[in-house]
């Protein structure tokens, strides 16, 4: 079957004859949208002709946007395409839908639960939403590449690499901007689970579960022997991470270089080497996050993680000491290379990050490592956001709702930030 574009107009049920108050009719008209939001089988064509803000399940998703990526609208105002095949390629597949999405704004949905084993990475063009709500959709062995694309939303998907090849679950690169990654479940990639790099900016990553992987996330990536060669290109990066769950990982939760980063209300739990890492004049506000680890816990790593260098590595032996290491010391990840190259390249920039830490919670054997350093250079978010004080109850909520879970997650009632209305 071919991918098909939804063209059925939104149907508002007529009031039954003899029903004077219209209450039952008004209730019934919203059932398709409500079923979709809460994991039911309703499809877009049952409630909306096109993905615009009059469509209840479209507007419900867009209301969850926060942070630097909040301007992303994906396929809003375009057309629906429904994926009907679970094959890697051919008619009705997700790959075919993404090829069609190059023609204009597209909101992609799925006709049924699907497990799609990929032969190679999928490329996501500009003005695209991939929306797995209401279905259980899993991409296996490879993931999604967002390269030079603008205005992209990825929500409610599982991506499992099974450690089968050196690739990423989500790679945002090459000047991409206005990207929102929401409610994904990402695991077992031999390279990284998520990158934001190479001049990409205005990205929000929210309510996503990162687990069972080694090198989890890079926010910018130094690819030159001259550490600051691409500083002007990459320092424009602005990334928000909130309400994400990093569980049973090894390191880089995340690792940030250059750029402006806001991390709030994330849960890091059971890392095997270290939690976060910042260096090379990254500017980061780290607030309201929860760090939890147990020095005596059992390691759940595979026998080894494959690496780009071809080295087989395992980090289980580090757990007793790593449990305390909620982060590497400021700049530690790049200090050695910086000192070796400083004279040759005449570095005047700092190898440390500019940090402001606020209201973070450390549980179990986890200990604070990072401290304020030139905090006046750290960002003051220009937007309004749903901030919650870090508590054990918040940790439980993140464990429950982060990942490819059913339905949307309501924003916290409490708001913070300079962008809030007076």
Where are these regions (language model features)?
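Right-handed parallel beta-helix
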Residues: 127, 132-135, 150-161, 176-190, ...
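Acidic glycine-/aspartate-rich tracts in secreted/extracellular proteins
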Residues: 87-88, 112-115, 135-136
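Extracellular beta-strand-rich solenoid/capping regions of secreted or surface-exposed proteins
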Residues: 95-103, 115-129, 137-155, 161-176
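Long, contiguous C-terminal flanking segments immediately downstream of a protein's structured core
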Residues: 47, 51-72, 76-79, 98-100, ...
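Sec-dependent signal peptide recognition
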Residues: 25-33
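N-terminal signal peptide c-region/cleavage motif recognized by signal peptidases
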Residues: 39-40
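Structural detector of coil-to-beta-strand junctions
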Residues: 143-145, 169-171, 193, 216-218, ...
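N-terminal secretory signal peptides that target proteins for export/translocation
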Residues: 1-25
């Amino acid at each position: 079957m071919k991918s098909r574009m939804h063209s059925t107009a939104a149907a508002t049920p007529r009031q039954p004859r003899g029903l004077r108050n219209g209450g039952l009719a008004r209730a019934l008209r919203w059932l398709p949208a409500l079923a979709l939001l809460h994991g039911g089988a309703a499809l877009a064509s049952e409630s909306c002709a096109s993905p615009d803000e009059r469509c209840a399940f479209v507007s419900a998703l867009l209301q969850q946007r926060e942070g630097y990526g909040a301007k992303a609208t994906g396929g809003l105002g375009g057309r629906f395409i429904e994926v009907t095949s679970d094959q890697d390629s051919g008619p009705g597949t997700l790959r075919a839908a993404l090829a069609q999405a190059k023609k204009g704004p597209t909101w992609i949905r799925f006709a049924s639960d699907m497990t799609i084993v990929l032969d190679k990475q999928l490329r996501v063009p500009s003005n695209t939403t991939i929306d797995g709500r209401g279905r259980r959709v899993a991409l296996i062995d490879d993931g999604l590449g967002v390269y030079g694309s603008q205005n992209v939303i990825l929500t409610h998907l599982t991506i499992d690499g099974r450690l089968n090849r050196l690739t990423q679950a989500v790679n945002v690169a090459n000047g991409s901007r206005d990207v929102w990654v929401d409610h994904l479940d990402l695991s077992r990639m031999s390279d990284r689970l998520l990158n934001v790099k190479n001049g990409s900016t205005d990205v929000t990553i929210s309510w996503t579960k990162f687990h069972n992987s080694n090198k989890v996330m890079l926010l910018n990536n130094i690819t030159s022997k001259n550490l600051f060669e691409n500083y002007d290109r990459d320092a424009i990066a602005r990334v928000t991470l909130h309400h994400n769950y990093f569980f049973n990982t090894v390191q880089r939760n995340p690792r940030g270089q250059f750029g402006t980063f806001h991390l709030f209300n994330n849960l890091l739990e059971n890392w095997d080497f270290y939690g976060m890492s910042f260096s090379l004049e990254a500017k980061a506000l780290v607030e309201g996050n929860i760090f939890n680890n147990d020095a005596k816990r059992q390691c759940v790593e595979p026998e080894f993680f494959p690496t780009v260098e071809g080295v087989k590595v395992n980090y289980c032996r580090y757990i007793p000491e790593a449990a305390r290491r909620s982060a590497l010391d400021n700049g530690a990840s790049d200090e050695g290379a910086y000192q070796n190259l400083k004279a040759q390249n005449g570095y005047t920039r700092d190898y440390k990050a500019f940090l402001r830490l606020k209201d973070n919670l450390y549980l179990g054997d986890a200990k604070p490592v990072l401290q304020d350093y030139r905090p006046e250079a750290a960002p003051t978010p220009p937007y309004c956001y749903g901030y919650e004080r870090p508590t054990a109850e918040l940790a439980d909520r993140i464990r429950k709702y982060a990942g490819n879970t059913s339905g949307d997650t309501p924003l916290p009632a409490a708001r913070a930030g300079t962008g809030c209305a007076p």
